Amino acid sequence: MKYTSYILALQLCVLLGFSGSYGQGPFFKEIENLKEYFNASNPDVAEGGPLFIEILKNWKEESDRKIIQSQIVSFYFKLFENFKDNQVIQRSVDIIKQDMFQKFLNGSSEKLEDFKKLIQISVDDMQIQRKAINELIKVMNDLSPKSNLIKRKRSQNLFRGRRASM
């Protein structure tokens, strides 16, 4: 009985090992390359706790997580932009960016361009600040769930009206 437990445990480890290596995607090796380049596995990296992991644990609902994930992805795109001229890690950065693009933006190049535009907006520019304040009411209304509900009901009523007239 004791040997059976060991054999089952060994099989489980082998299965988990294989599924882990195949399920990681092409970015896994590239992340390991970046970790090595930045010496990110050094124990001093853990000082002060994690940057994102604890925050992500606090956000359970999918829609809420998307909000936090967008900020995290924005951070990584800015970080990668700082290393765009570094030939040593460029391939790794490009592969990771492409995979992140596929996962977060579903491969939509329009969404990527909009996302990049938002990242590039400078909050120090007075003209940008003025434009942002001018658009604040529209942005706040767009954030309001009530306005989305009204739009949805209006759209449903239009659709029902068309169906009734057919």
UniProtKB/Swiss-Prot annotation:
One of its GO terms (cellular component) is extracellular space. The modification Pyrrolidone carboxylic acid is found at residue 24. It is found in: Secreted. Keywords: Antiviral defense, Cytokine, Glycoprotein, Growth regulation, Pyrrolidone carboxylic acid, Secreted, Signal. PANTHER family: INTERFERON GAMMA. Residues 1-23 form the signal peptide. GO terms for biological process: adaptive immune response; defense response to virus; humoral immune response; positive regulation of autophagy. Gene3D superfamilies: 1.20.1250.10. It holds the Pfam family IFN-gamma. Transmembrane segments: none annotated. The keyword Membrane does not apply. Released primarily from activated T lymphocytes. Homodimer. Interacts with IFNGR1 (via extracellular domain); this interaction promotes IFNGR1 dimerization. The lineage of its organism: Eukaryota, Metazoa, Chordata, Craniata, Vertebrata. The keyword Secreted applies. Type II interferon produced by immune cells such as T-cells and NK cells that plays crucial roles in antimicrobial, antiviral, and antitumor responses by activating effector immune cells and enhancing antigen presentation. Primarily signals through the JAK-STAT pathway after interaction with its receptor IFNGR1 to affect gene regulation. Upon IFNG binding, IFNGR1 intracellular domain opens out to allow association of downstream signaling components JAK2, JAK1 and STAT1, leading to STAT1 activation, nuclear translocation and transcription of IFNG-regulated genes. SUPFAM superfamilies: 4-helical cytokines (SSF47266). This is Interferon gamma. Its main location: secreted. It comes from the Eukaryota. One of its GO terms (molecular function) is type II interferon receptor binding. It comes from Cervus elaphus. Glycans are attached at residues 39, 106. Belongs to the type II (or gamma) interferon family.
